[in-house]
A protein has these predicted regions:
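Hydrophobic positions on the alpha1 helix immediately C-terminal to the Walker A/P-loop
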Residues: 159, 163
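The conserved Walker
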Residues: 152
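N-terminal accessory targeting/assembly segments
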Residues: 1-93
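Conserved lysine of the Walker
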Residues: 156
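Hydrophobic anchor at the beta1->P-loop junction of P-loop NTPases
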Residues: 146-148
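Post-Walker A helix-loop "phosphate-sensing" segment adjacent to the P-loop in P-loop NTPases
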Residues: 165-173
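P-loop NTP-binding catalytic core
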Residues: 65-67, 71, 77-143
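N-terminal regions of ATP-driven nucleic-acid and macromolecular assemblies
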Residues: 1, 29, 128-132, 172
Length: 173
């Protein structure tokens, strides 16, 4: 049976090692996947709106986690130090690779991450029309300022991207 390939999913999976990317390319329901989760010593898992489910694949190794981060950072992890201090690397297409490990500190300041224990690949997707949620507050004129608050995974970035697209489509820059 042929698996329907989802463009956003495939683009995000581009930072994975080739063998793991090939395994996950065969996953059905790619268009529903919100996150790919990789934890050392456990098989990968996928998160959809219906919840998380483990995949029947080989367990993730610490070396594989390091390779995923290295590939996501285009083999230049040091150039992503500022981003890694915040716990993630932004990928082409707006996808984000969250990292979990031990903070490396110098003089009381976080300077990087070591001992990766897991990575989480969040897949960015376009969501047409969600800007209508905030339209009553921003109106047609110049927007003032706004603060978007919600737990992780509730669509703050999606809402903001769609709002910027909608404002841009109306000719505002």
């Amino acid at each position: 049976m042929e698996v329907k390939q989802d463009k956003a999913y495939q683009q995000a999976a581009g930072c994975l090692p080739p063998l793991r990317a090939a395994q996950l390319a065969a996953l059905e329901g790619q268009e529903e996947v919100e996150e790919l989760r990789f934890r050392a010593g456990r098989p990968p898992a996928v998160k959809t709106a219906r919840g998380e489910r483990g995949l029947e694949l080989a367990v993730v190794t610490a070396q594989e986690l390091r390779e995923i981060l290295s590939r996501a950072a285009r083999y230049s992890v040091h150039s992503y130090t500022e981003s890694l201090k915040n716990g993630f690397v932004t990928l082409t297409g707006g996808h984000r690779l969250g990292v979990c490990g031990t903070a490396a500190e110098e003089n009381g300041k976080v300077v990087g991450i070591r001992g990766l224990s897991s990575v989480n690949l969040r897949i960015a997707r376009q969501a047409w029309g969600v800007d209508a949620v905030i339209a009553p507050w921003v109106g047609e004129g110049e927007p003032q300022s706004m603060l978007l608050l919600s737990p992780p995974g509730f669509g703050k970035t999606t809402l903001l991207r769609e709002w910027v697209r909608a404002v841009s489509d109306k000719g505002h820059t």
